Amino acid sequence: MSVVGIIAEFNPFHSGHEFLLNQARLIAGNDPIVVVMSGNYVQRGEMAIMSKYQRAKVALQSGADLVFETPFSTAVEPADLFSLGNIEQLAKLGVTDLVFGVENANLNFAYLGSKIAEIPQNHMDFKDYSQTYSTQYNQMVAREVGHEVNQPNAILGLAYAVANHNLGSPLKLHPVNRIGAGHDDLLQRNGVVQSASAIRNLLLHGEDTSNLKYWVPKAEAIELSKQEIYPNWNLLYPFLKYRIESSSIDDLRQIYQMSEGLEYKMKQEIHLSRDFTEFLRRIKSKRYTYSRLRRLSLYTLLNVTQDDMIASFNEESLMLLGFSKTGRQYLKKNRKDFQTEIISKVDKRSAKSGSLALQVRTDRLFEQIMGVDQNFGQRPIEV
């Protein structure tokens, strides 16, 4: 039995994702395709453009059999922890194979992952403060394994491979060549496949949405066209500004990943910044990537502390967002053997501890912005 897993954000789901699901189906055959998908907050430190249930529904309609929500404590983390948490959860669900999109599927990711995992993580190698940690890490990888990997999906694919190796290689890796636009490419008007970031930019800049039907499934294109609010940092910035200005230095110091005096820098620069882009520019240094600072801003906005993340990570459960007929059968037959708790319905008891407590709390802001309940009263989607 080949139970194929996919780690995803689907932010939003587009034809490139549909291609990846089709490739996964070639491996799975009649066996299930299991997706672990980030919820209403994504790895780069932003709100998702659509709700987790909207994105899960499109994924199920496009060929996925089970969609679970990646806990916040894994979803909003750098690539290494994002990969480790997601692969560990897939293995606990009985997944045997991992399919992921990259720019060059000819690379032997399993081999490269094992070689990188053997490199001592000696922080003395990363003391050049004129460059970010990630830049120095990529340079070290190129030096040690003989391959320069600097494209975003290949970097993430390597993180999957390293995590898989460190967990004892529970999953067989299947890299698939991406089709269409690159990760951050602008929309190519005559093309068919567009990147998620390009589609988000189109929506956020109020451009014509008539071409969406060529890039995303028809039902999703209709929903996106009708959607009145597209979450973004400029929308959230007043809330972040209030949070920072009303918090003491000691309060800010408790925020997850707040370090090296960034609490003082954020306090100082928030008064001088007209919008989130300017704020990021003002607190940016060569030591930190913009992604790291966006995640830190999100933790600050949502008041996520070190203790919150530890409690969530130590008691991670998985929220079931939806299933197909095949997915239901797989759940019924194998749920007792899963090594993680599956939550199908949020109630007051389950929402008080572990990863679900953090999920429910952080989702409240998304609910306020979008006006749609995300946990209480929701049931898994069935297609």
Swiss-Prot record:
Its EC number is 6.3.4.-. Gene3D superfamilies: HUPs. The keyword Transit peptide does not apply. It is found in: Cytoplasm. Pfam families: HIGH_NTase1. One of its GO terms (cellular component) is cytoplasm. InterPro entries: Rossmann-like_a/b/a_fold, tRNA(Met)_cyd_acetate_ligase. SUPFAM superfamilies: Nucleotidylyl transferase. It catalyses: cytidine(34) in elongator tRNA(Met) + acetate + ATP = N(4)-acetylcytidine(34) in elongator tRNA(Met) + AMP + diphosphate. Keywords: ATP-binding, Cytoplasm, Ligase, Nucleotide-binding, RNA-binding, tRNA processing, tRNA-binding. GO terms for molecular function: ATP binding; ligase activity, forming carbon-nitrogen bonds; tRNA binding. ATP binds at residues 7-20, 101, 153, 178-179. Belongs to the TmcAL family. PANTHER family: TRNA(MET) CYTIDINE ACETATE LIGASE (PTHR37825:SF1). This is tRNA(Met) cytidine acetate ligase. It comes from Lactobacillus helveticus (strain DPC 4571). The lineage of its organism: Bacteria, Bacillati, Bacillota, Bacilli, Lactobacillales. The gene is tmcAL.
